[in-house]
Amino acid sequence: MVLAVPADHPLARLESIAFADTVDLDHVSLHEASAIHAYLRQICNQMHKHLKLRIQVSNFEAACRMVESDVGVGIMPEAAARRHARTMRIACVPLQDEWAVRELQVCVRSLAGLPAFARDLVDLLVADAKAAAEGKTIA
């Protein structure tokens, strides 16, 4: 997970940041029913803090557009932020917190038992995850 900030924001120069250092900033977040918003609210509750929300949007592209327009900063998956940073003036600052490293798994009973299109999907997801871990993207 990263903190997305406008490219010219003072925090854009940081190598990383703790989530606790961002909660008092104006935030752009996904809608309340989203998993990421619920998780951030849970983290804030554990810290006895409230996330300072400026606006809630429906997707990461909209969040990045709001960040680019200096409406606020946004916590989001690194892959989403970097994808939009290619076309928008935003910077991605990695979060230092342990919880910010997400491990995603693909679970199937039998990979060999899947239809070819499903195996292709699993292969694509695994390749994308490996590329993201190396800081690359796949087409």
Predicted segment positions?
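Conserved sugar-transfer catalytic core signal across GT-A, GT-B, and GT-C glycosyltransferases
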Residues: 17-18, 62, 102
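Generic preference for hydrophobic
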Residues: 3-4, 27, 75, 92, ...
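Short secondary-structure boundary/capping segments
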Residues: 11, 18-20, 45, 82, ...
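Flexible hinge/capping segments at coil-to-helix
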Residues: 1-27
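Hydrophobic hinge/microswitch elements
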Residues: 29-91
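Short secondary-structure boundary segments
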Residues: 7, 78-80, 104
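A late-sequence structural motif
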Residues: 12, 91-134
